[in-house]
Curated annotation (Swiss-Prot):
Ubiquitous. High expression in brain, skeletal muscle, and heart, but is also detected at lower levels in most other tissues. This is Sodium/hydrogen exchanger 6. The gene is SLC9A6. GO terms for biological process: axon extension; dendrite extension; establishment of cell polarity; monoatomic ion transport; neuron projection morphogenesis; potassium ion transmembrane transport; regulation of intracellular pH; sodium ion import across plasma membrane. Homodimer. Interacts with RACK1; regulates the distribution of SLC9A6 between endosomes and the plasma membrane. The lineage of its organism: Eukaryota, Metazoa, Chordata, Craniata, Vertebrata.
Length: 701
């Protein structure tokens, strides 16, 4: 029995060979696999976290390095402005005859740009540049998948093939090159606004017809003359094989509009220092102010030229008239928007008590003025035109509602901003000659451009002056015409228009050539202004307050009659309705509006208008006097003017009362009583009035 008990059992395949055993072992295998994968994942996650931390450290270092470089770039511009200010101070003591501070600011910019371009190189490890990415188009935004993470890259611009090995240096130079919108949204508004806010309106409106002719007709003539000449140059370049890209007639016209924007800031600064004849100063200043506005609207109209059909560069009559309509619409809309913003600011300052809080008053004035530019641009108009007429409106109405402290603050604030912005732009021009990456210089185009701007300026000044002299009592002399021809400098506006779009080959060539034109005109014409004044025998040292003393009596009366004919309706409307509505002065609206408007008139009339406590302080306005009872008060003395039919005019100081009145209207502050309304008319806030009767002034300048 025992032997059978030790019987040899057959050999088995294994413990889990049975189905039941396999079912029991399956969970064990699953647990083991999960453990292995968890361990591998933990190891992989640790490496990923380490790589992520390394990437964060590298990003922080790059951000810190970029911040330091940006600070250094801004410091460069601050030092340039500081050096320019010190140079101006030096020139106040020792004037360099053939060099103005604006030209020297450009030289400073050139030197700094030269050092940045050729003297400083960025180490290759600062920027990680990959040159193996190839796409068929140039999208504005590029999303790149890097190890499962998506990164956003923005388009900065085209780099020529011969500069691929210097991308690091290009990146450094690109950082000192501002976005063109910075010029239009930050630097141009204070310059243009100050031109309108500080406008000497008496001289401006006296020559308004001539200024409008030079600004509108002259700019259009200059644009088409330059565009036609440049199209001939471009055709010659195509024939000789010098043209490497497309250049159409519309591009030539656009270039003509760009370089037709004159900016004689250097000449006007010298005129102001030497006290050049006020008529010449008014013509040049008025033309430059409106010329900038016309040039920018004209360039926008040319860009908007879109003829029907596939070829957008052929001549089409319908498209031409459409562009003319766009020009008129943009200009008139911008004018209306600028004037409306000034009116709104005047109403706010009149019907609130902000004058009790000068800081808030100045802040509101500043923001409303600057927002005019941005509002016009956002609505598709031109901010330059809007902010110019906003400045004129603010000076005519809002300025009178401000407190005395705010009046000084606003004038000084915008004068400072204008000074810094102008000098910054001139310094930046010199810098851009070396830091801009896509310059295109063509000798034929450059020479043709210089010939074109001289011929365009001549076609503007001389024919229009001949036509204007046919209807002017005070003729524009040949020496004035030669000086206006000589003073056609190009500056900040031409530079800003040219740099705004440099995407195509044609625009790059236009920008590079415009830069050379600005350098040449500022250095040569700006530096030769004093010598040209002497050569043309133009009067200097002329006090604007004394300009009428040497004018014959019959010419003064003729000028007065012409002014009355041109502006009588406007001045009556302005004096009787607009100034009482928008300021604290003038006759109450209850006396000028119809009786049915009594409630509205009482609501809109300021209490000061009834009490005659707040006087109208409209600097540099020109009053048109009609026949009637007019008395001019000098302290305790009063001069009365008689109607034109009076046969026995009173004599005062050896002259007729009308002569005394004409002299006094040309200078200083005085009190004028017209039909019971007291009105202060400060004619020039920059110079004290003549003390003809040893009396003191009645109001502040």
């Amino acid at each position: 029995m025992a032997r059978r008990g030790w019987r040899r059992a057959p050999l088995r395949r294994g413990v889990g060979s049975s189905p039941r055993a396999r079912r029991l072992m399956r969970p064990l295998w699953l647990l083991l696999a999960v453990g292995v994968f968890d361990w591998a994942g933990a190891s992989d996650g640790g490496g990923g976290e380490a790589r992520a931390m390394d990437e964060e450290i590298v990003s922080e270092k790059q951000a810190e390095e970029s911040h330091r470089q940006d600070s250094a770039n801004l410091l460069i511009f601050i030092l340039l402005l500081t050096l320019t200010i010190l140079t101006i101070w030096l020139f106040k003591h020792r004037r360099a005859r053939f060099l103005h501070e604006t030209g020297l600011a450009m030289i400073y910019g050139l030197l700094v740009g030269l050092v940045l371009r050729y003297g400083i190189h960025v180490p290759s490890d600062v920027n990680n540049v990959t040159l193996s990415c190839e796409v068929q188009s140039s999208p504005t935004t590029l999303l790149v998948n890097v190890s499962g993470k998506f990164y956003e890259y923005m388009l900065k611009g085209e780099i020529s093939s011969h500069e691929l090995n210097n991308v690091q240096d290009n990146e450094m130079l690109r950082k000192v090159t501002f976005d063109p919108e910075v010029f239009f949204n930050i630097l141009l508004p204070p310059i243009i606004f100050y031109a309108g806010y500080s406008l000497k309106r008496r001289h401006f409106f006296r020559n308004l017809g001539s200024i409008l002719a030079y600004a509108f007709l002259g700019t259009a003539i200059s644009c088409f003359v330059i565009g036609s000449i440049m199209y001939g140059c471009v055709t010659l370049m195509k024939v000789t094989g010098q043209l490497a890209g497309d250049f159409y007639f519309t591009d030539c016209l656009l270039f003509g509009a760009i370089v037709s924007a004159t900016d004689p800031v250097t000449v006007l600064a010298i005129f102001h220092e030497l006290q050049v004849d006020v008529e010449l100063y008014a013509l040049l200043f008025g033309e430059s102010v409106l010329n900038d506005a016309v040039a920018i609207v004209l360039s926008s109209s040319i860009v908007a030229y879109q003829p029907a059909g596939d070829n957008s560069h052929t001549f089409d009559v319908t498209a031409m008239f459409k562009s003319i309509g766009i020009f008129l619409g943009i200009f008139s809309g911008s004018f209306a928007m600028g004037a409306a913003t000034g009116v709104v600011t005047a109403l706010v300052t009149k019907f609130t008590k902000l004058r009790e809080f000068q800081l808030l008053e100045t802040g509101l004035f500043f923001l409303m003025s600057w927002s005019t530019f941005l509002l016009a641009e956002a609505w598709g108009f031109t901010g330059v035109v809007a902010v110019l007429f906003c400045g004129i409106t603010q000076a005519h109405y809002t300025y009178n509602n401000l407190s005395t402290e705010s009046q000084h603050r606003t004038k000084q604030l915008f004068e400072l901003l204008n000074f810094l912005a102008e000098n910054f732009i001139f310094s930046y021009m010199g810098l851009t000659l070396f830091t801009f990456q896509n310059h295109v210089f063509n000798p034929t185009f450059v020479v043709g451009a210089f010939v074109a701007i001289f011929l365009g300026r001549a076609a503007n000044i001389y024919p229009l002056s001949l036509l204007l002299n046919l209807g002017r009592r005070s003729k524009i002399g040949s020496n004035f015409q030669h000086m206006m021809m000589f003073a056609g400098l190009r500056g900040a506006m031409a530079f800003a228009l040219a740099i705004r779009d440099t995407a195509t080959y044609a625009r790059q060539m236009m920008f590079s050539t415009t830069l050379l034109i600005v350098f040449f005109t500022v250095w040569v014409f700006g530096g030769g202004t004093t010598a040209m004044l002497s050569c043309l025998h133009i009067r200097v040292g002329v006090d604007s307050d004394q300009e009428h003393l040497g004018v014959p009596e019959n010419e003064r009366r003729t000028t007065k009659a012409e002014s009355a004919w041109l502006f009588r309706m406007w001045y009556n409307f302005d004096h009787n309705y607009l100034k009482p509505l928008l300021t604290h002065s003038g006759p109450p609206l209850t006396t000028t509006l119809p009786a049915c408007c009594g409630p509205i008139a009482r609501c809109l009339t300021s209490p000061q208008a009834y009490e005659n406590q707040e006087q109208l302080k409209d600097d540099d306005s020109d009053l048109i006097l009609n026949d009637g009872d007019i008395s001019l008060t000098y302290g305790d003395s009063t001069v009365n003017t008689e109607p034109a039919t009076s046969s026995a005019p009173r004599r005062f100081m050896g002259n007729s009362s009308e002569d005394a009145l004409d002299r006094e209207l040309a200078f200083g502050d005085h009190e004028l009583v017209i039909r019971g309304t007291r009105l202060v008319l400060p004619m020039d806030d920059s110079e004290p009035p003549l003390n003809l009767l040893d009396n003191t002034r009645h109001g502040p300048a």
